[in-house]
Amino acid sequence: MSKTSLHATTIYAVRHNGEAAMAGDGQVTLGEQVIMKQTARKVRRLYEGKVLAGFAGSVADAFTLFEKFETKLQQFSGNLERAAVELAQEWRGDKQLRQLEAMLIVMDKDAILVVSGTGEVIAPDDDLIAIGSGGNYALSAGRALKRHASQLSAKEMAYESLKVASDICVFTNDNIIVETL
């Protein structure tokens, strides 16, 4: 992580009982010591509101990737998997794009995918995933909630998982935004 670049962290996504939700915290950090913003919006609706996308990593890089991913969604008529694979191939194959420091979670009602700059497109086995500095905390909390509090909605699971991450990770705050499909 560059000491002068702006970074944003912790995105969590879950599909549960026919619902889909994605949550992101609001913290943007300059290097490793300064909080630059506490109310960033890192989860976006794309493709006429049918797709959610969230990022962890460099803010400027993530916006570039959002634009490219939305272009791919348009090109492939909203086909999430095809758009994600095409973005990953372009990202991996382009010398300038390979320099981007961000990861994406993208989801629609039917699938959740993580897209990385090394060309991976990964679908989680258990319909939940998290990325960013607090990702492991959010993922652990989410798995526990899914197993032992299945009466919760996807939105509640997403919020509570990120809340746990914000209690532990110094790069994740509790200004949580949740989007649902």
UniProtKB/Swiss-Prot annotation:
The Gene Ontology biological process terms listed for this entry are:
proteolysis involved in protein catabolic process
Q: Which UniProt keywords apply?
A: Allosteric enzyme, Cytoplasm, Hydrolase, Metal-binding, Protease, Sodium, Stress response, Threonine protease
Gene Ontology cellular component annotations, sorted alphabetically: HslUV protease complex; proteasome core complex
Keyword Cytoplasm set for record: yes
The EC number(s) attached to this protein equal 3.4.25.2
Asked whether the UniProt record includes Protease among its keywords, one would answer yes
Annotated localization: Cytoplasm
Matching entries from Pfam families are given as: Proteasome
Task: Summarize what activates or inhibits it.
Answer: Allosterically activated by HslU binding.
Q: Which reaction does it catalyse?
A: ATP-dependent cleavage of peptide bonds with broad specificity
Q: What does the subunit section of this Swiss-Prot or TrEMBL entry state?
A: A double ring-shaped homohexamer of HslV is capped on each side by a ring-shaped HslU homohexamer. The assembly of the HslU/HslV complex is dependent on binding of ATP.
Name-wise, this protein is: ATP-dependent protease subunit HslV
This chain's source organism reads: Staphylococcus haemolyticus (strain JCSC1435)
- Gene encoding it? hslV
